[in-house]
Amino acid sequence: MIPEERLQSVIARFEAVQSEMNSDVPRDRFVALSKEFSELEPVAAAIGHLLARRREYADAEQLLRVRDMAEMAKEEIARLNEELPRLEHEVQLMLLPKDAADDRNVILEVRAGTGGDEAALFAGDLFRMYERYASNQGWKVELIAASEGEMGGYKEIIAGISGPGVYAKLKFESGVHRVQRVPVTEGGGRIHTSAATVAVLPEAEEVDVEIEDKDLRIDVYRASGAGGQHVNKTESAVRITHLPTGIVVAQQDEKSQHKNKARAMQILRARIFDAERERLDRERSAARKGQVGSGDRSERIRTYNFPQSRVTDHRINLTLHKLDQVLEGEALGELIDALIAEDQAARLAAMGDEA
């Protein structure tokens, strides 16, 4: 049971925010208060509902001592015994510390791994899956860079996805995705295994990551197309190396050097921000023990088996026999929701261990 003082402190904060919003405050302060208000409002409502039911339970226990009311009180207690655990659980989930990046937009990177042309085709399948899922969520997808495979698909594709709660939903997609199927180039009908790597990076603002000019090496060169031939006569392509971390980003998809540099800096900032978050996560690894996956890019997280039309997420041992619907982006939400639920359960258990 959540201590009442913990619940009352949330309601007190909600009322304080509400009161301050009604006073004369600077615009930037009002914007910050409005954001906090919108986050606290559903939590305060759920807590109010829970506290009301707790009071009803206490009243019913008192009525047990009144002979004429005892039977009705027993029925009331039985009803509340069913309702209260559900309400407690809902409020517990709402009180879990939020990942500060959950509301951020993301940079999605999909790269072909082992498997040559087939891996590039699979990388294309994965990107389209995320594109369709994003469309169903009402999010916006903007292509940043793409290197196409010789037989289709992508050797690498990078896109920005923006909308409410993007990182919260997609953050568990990072890792190695494996496919088992008969490639279009396979005449003997043998099943091959290929892989693609997905990275979901929360988009970083300049205030999140301080990058000094002295820490950058910027090289410019002529953009090249398939086969290595130069596709323009100006040095519009940009490669930026962040010397302290060794992170390198190259960008040539835009026609102007200025735009390519801006794109490269956007990706670089996100990668540095993500690397710092990973470092902090490792330092908190004891607290994170048991949570969904490690976020390790080399961790095999999911297998897509075409002959059996199944998708298995290895982190939570969940198998769906609806591969087509997953790749269409329709059933991907079932996997994502299950991963979020598992993560919440693990964090609740960790909070219980600490209590």
UniProtKB/Swiss-Prot annotation:
SMART domains: PCRF (SM00937)
GO terms of molecular function: translation release factor activity, codon specific
Location(s) in or outside the cell: Cytoplasm
UniProt xrefs under InterPro entries: PCRF, Pep_chain_release_fac_I, Pep_chain_release_fac_I_sf, Prokaryotic/Mito_RF, RF-1
Processing and modification events after translation: Methylated by PrmC. Methylation increases the termination efficiency of RF1.
Keywords: Cytoplasm, Methylation, Protein biosynthesis
Annotated Gene Ontology cellular component terms: cytoplasm
Chain positions covered by the region annotation Disordered: 280-299
Post-translational modification N5-methylglutamine, affected residues: Q229
Keyword Cytoplasm: yes
PANTHER family found in the cross-reference section: LD18447P
Family as reported in the entry's similarity comment: Belongs to the prokaryotic/mitochondrial release factor family.
Cited function: Peptide chain release factor 1 directs the termination of translation in response to the peptide chain termination codons UAG and UAA.
Protein name: Peptide chain release factor 1
Species name: Parvibaculum lavamentivorans (strain DS-1 / DSM 13023 / NCIMB 13966)
